[in-house]
From Swiss-Prot:
Membrane topology: Peripheral membrane protein
Official protein name in the record: NADH-quinone oxidoreductase subunit I
Quaternary structure note: NDH-1 is composed of 14 different subunits. Subunits NuoA, H, J, K, L, M, N constitute the membrane sector of the complex.
Keyword Acetylation set for record: no
Gene Ontology biological-process annotations: aerobic respiration
Binding residues for [4Fe-4S] cluster 1: 63, 66, 69, 112
Intrachain S-S bonds: none
One GO MF term attached to the UniProt entry: NADH:ubiquinone reductase (non-electrogenic) activity
One family name in Pfam for this protein: Fer4_7
Names of required cofactors: [4Fe-4S] cluster
C-alpha cells in the first residue's frame, strides 16, 4: 500500500466508517432472535443430543462390549464393564455415561461397529441434582426404546453422507 493510500485511510477513518455502516445496516433489519421455549428452530439430522443405547428388532441389545466408545471418549465420560455369557458372547453388565463430563463430540457414535450407542436429537433434558445427569445402562436403553423410530429415521437421512 502506498503512503498516500495509507494517509487517506487513516485520515478519513475509512475502517471506522465501514464498521459503522455495517452496524447501521443491521440496526434496521428484521431481528432474528428466537424466544426459545415458545419458538423452536429446526434441528439438523446430525444434531448430537442425549445419548441412547439401541436394541435389535428381536429385543436383544446391540452393544457387544468392545469398549471402543470408552477408549475413544476424550472426556472419559463412559464407563463399561462386561462379562462373557454362556454362549461365548460378550455383553455389558454396566454402561454408564456421565453427561456432566460429556462434550457431545460424537466419537462414541462414530466408533461403534454395531450402531449401539447413538446421540439423539433430544436437547431438552435436565437434572435437578448432579447425579441426575449420570445415565446408567437401563436409562440409556429406555431412551433408545422410546425414540427408536426417530433414531432410525435420522440414521436413514444421514446414510447417504457416511
Amino acid at each position: 500500500m502506498s503512503a498516500i493510500q495509507h494517509f487517506f485511510k487513516t485520515f478519513f477513518l475509512t475502517e471506522l466508517l465501514q464498521g459503522l455502516a455495517l452496524t447501521g445496516r443491521y440496526t434496521f433489519k428484521r431481528k432474528v432472535t428466537v424466544q426459545f421455549p415458545e419458538e423452536k428452530t429446526p434441528i439438523s439430522p446430525r444434531f448430537r443430543g442425549l445419548h441412547a443405547l439401541r436394541r435389535y428388532e428381536n429385543g436383544e441389545e446391540r452393544c457387544i462390549a468392545c469398549k471402543l466408545c470408552e477408549a475413544v471418549c476424550p472426556a472419559m465420560a463412559i464407563t463399561i464393564e462386561s462379562e462373557t455369557r454362556a454362549d461365548n458372547t460378550r455383553r455389558t453388565t454396566r454402561y454408564d455415561i456421565d453427561l456432566t463430563k460429556c462434550i457431545f463430540c460424537g466419537f462414541c457414535e462414530e466408533s461403534c461397529p454395531v450402531d449401539s450407542i447413538v446421540e439423539t436429537q433430544i436437547l431438552e433434558y435436565h437434572g435437578e441434582k448432579r447425579g441426575d445427569l449420570y445415565f446408567t445402562k437401563e436409562m440409556l436403553l429406555a431412551v433408545g426404546d422410546r425414540y427408536e423410530k426417530d433414531i432410525a429415521a435420522a440414521k436413514a437421512a444421514d446414510a447417504p453422507y457416511r
